[in-house]
């Protein structure tokens, strides 16, 4: 091996394999592009991007880590979303959930079940 040499596998790396995914239609109704990172809580993206936010709660884009999707003004497209894994704690972003995703998942609700979504 040569110092600094890369030895790559012929086998492709499969991202998010086995994760249950959904597809939803989104439209950027704003006049500026919107960029959404791979691990951004999709339900909290720019309010000028219209889509079913209840279905997107607890989900992120099904794209490789560190990448992003860009929606140009007027763009209508379908995105593929997968659930957050691990402890499923959503903190920050637009501060709409700020706690356990499950505490905010109420069937048919358009707002979090309890204020900030904080758990004790």
Curated annotation (Swiss-Prot):
It comes from Corynebacterium efficiens (strain DSM 44549 / YS-314 / AJ 12310 / JCM 11189 / NBRC 100395). PANTHER family: UREASE. It is found in: Cytoplasm. InterPro entries: Urease_beta-like, Urease_betasu_sf, Urease_subunit. One of its GO terms (biological process) is urea catabolic process. This is Urease subunit beta. Its main location: cytoplasm. The gene is ureB. The keyword Hydrolase applies. Its EC number is 3.5.1.5. GO terms for molecular function: urease activity. It holds the Pfam family Urease_beta. Heterotrimer of UreA (gamma), UreB (beta) and UreC (alpha) subunits. Three heterotrimers associate to form the active enzyme. One of its GO terms (cellular component) is urease complex.
């Amino acid at each position: 091996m040569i110092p600094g040499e890369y030895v790559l596998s012929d086998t492709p790396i499969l991202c998010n394999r086995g994760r249950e995914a959904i597809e939803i239609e989104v439209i950027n109704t704003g006049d500026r592009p919107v960029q959404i990172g791979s691990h951004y809580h999709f339900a909290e993206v720019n309010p000028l991007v219209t889509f079913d936010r209840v279905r997107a709660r607890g989900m992120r884009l099904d794209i490789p880590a560190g990448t992003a999707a860009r929606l140009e003004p007027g763009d209508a497209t379908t995105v593929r979303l997968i659930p957050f894994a691990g402890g499923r704690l959503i903190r920050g972003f637009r501060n709409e959930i700020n706690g356990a995703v499950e505490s905010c998942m109420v069937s048919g609700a358009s707002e979090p079940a309890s204020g900030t979504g904080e758990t004790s």
